[in-house]
A protein has these predicted regions:
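Carboxylate/His-rich catalytic cores and anion/metal-binding grooves
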Residues: 10
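Phosphate-binding/switch region of NTP-binding enzymes
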Residues: 92-185
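Motif I (Walker A/P-loop) of helicase-class P-loop NTPases
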Residues: 1-7
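Conserved inter-motif catalytic segment of the P-loop NTP-binding fold
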Residues: 5, 13-101, 105
Length: 185
């Protein structure tokens, strides 16, 4: 809901919004409830990491102000993932290498265009053989460290599991949850 509200506020400031959806899960009614104008929102199916980065590069060339929302990095495959087999070792670190190259190429053009790139990602459990590493770094984010070096602000949102943490509207529709927020640069 936070990303949808950010998109709605960007539209109110006459900023173009490109929404990359890799999960095919965004509901237009949900976006409208958040305040988005669907007529002015550019919805793009995120076919691959390369496709998202190339499309952003192309849109930056239009000279318009942009908010790019990528939902989500974790579930967007690389071209190699799509073309390859199911063996995870065959494409190990491929997404991280593509992101590293893409972010080094796009960081300055994004800044010069006064654009914003909002990347949604997910926390995954750090599966490691080292107990000390598992305790100090219990979670990792997909895509390697490339985004760690590229972001100007990282917002960690972790939810509470209790039903009491749910926020409902006047009709009983769940519109959110209480979360813990950690800001990081």
């Amino acid at each position: 809901f936070l990303a949808a509200q950010i998109a709605a506020n960007a539209q109110k400031m006459d900023i173009n919004v490109a929404y990359f959806d890799s999960e095919s899960a965004i509901d237009p009614a949900f976006l409208e409830r958040a305040g988005c104008d669907l007529e002015r929102l550019m919805y793009i199916q995120a076919e691959s990491v390369e496709f998202v980065l190339e499309t952003i590069e192309e849109l930056l060339g239009t000279g318009h102000k942009w908010l790019f929302v990528w939902d989500s990095l974790a579930l967007t495959p690389s071209n190699g993932d799509v073309a390859g087999d199911f063996n995870p070792l065959s494409s190990m670190a491929e997404k991280a290498r593509i992101l590293s190259k893409g972010m080094s190429k796009l960081t300055v053009p994004i800044a010069n265009a006064e654009a914003t790139f909002l990347v949604l990602n997910q926390l995954k459990t750090n599966i490691t053989r080292s107990p000390s590493e598992a305790m100090t770094t219990p979670y990792v984010t997909p895509g390697g460290k490339a985004m760690h070096y590229a972001y100007s602000l990282r917002i960690w949102l972790t939810g509470r599991k209790a039903k009491a943490s749910f926020i409902n509207d006047e009709n009983g529709f769940r519109i959110g949850s209480e979360v813990k927020v950690k800001l990081e640069k």
